[in-house]
Amino acid sequence: MIKTTLLFFATALAEIIGCFLPWLWLRKGASVLLLLPAALSLMLFVWLLTLHPAASGRVYAAYGGVYVMTALIWLRVVDGVRLSLYDWAGAAVALCGMLIIVAGWGRA
């Protein structure tokens, strides 16, 4: 389960970077050249999704929980926003859902 969770975090990071770089270009006036690493990051994201050992719908559902946590870490580290109790509680609920889905992969 640890390997799967780490793979989910890598997948989420690739997706967030792939979306953040165009955001910098569109919202902050950064270089259009950021679109190239953004596209590469999104290709990595898609490839990483294929490495998960379950049906795509289950992978996407479970991945959502890890994405929430990764996005909140990004919010704190990159955006410099302090997380609230609600952020932590929501992330905990999302991660519990992910763990339940992943635990049932071999049983479904």
Swiss-Prot record:
The chain crosses the membrane at residues 6-26, 29-49, 61-81, 85-105. It is a multi-pass membrane protein. It comes from the Bacteria. Keywords: Cell inner membrane, Cell membrane, Membrane, Transmembrane, Transmembrane helix. HAMAP family: UPF0060. Belongs to the UPF0060 family. This is UPF0060 membrane protein ESA_01751. It comes from Cronobacter sakazakii (strain ATCC BAA-894).
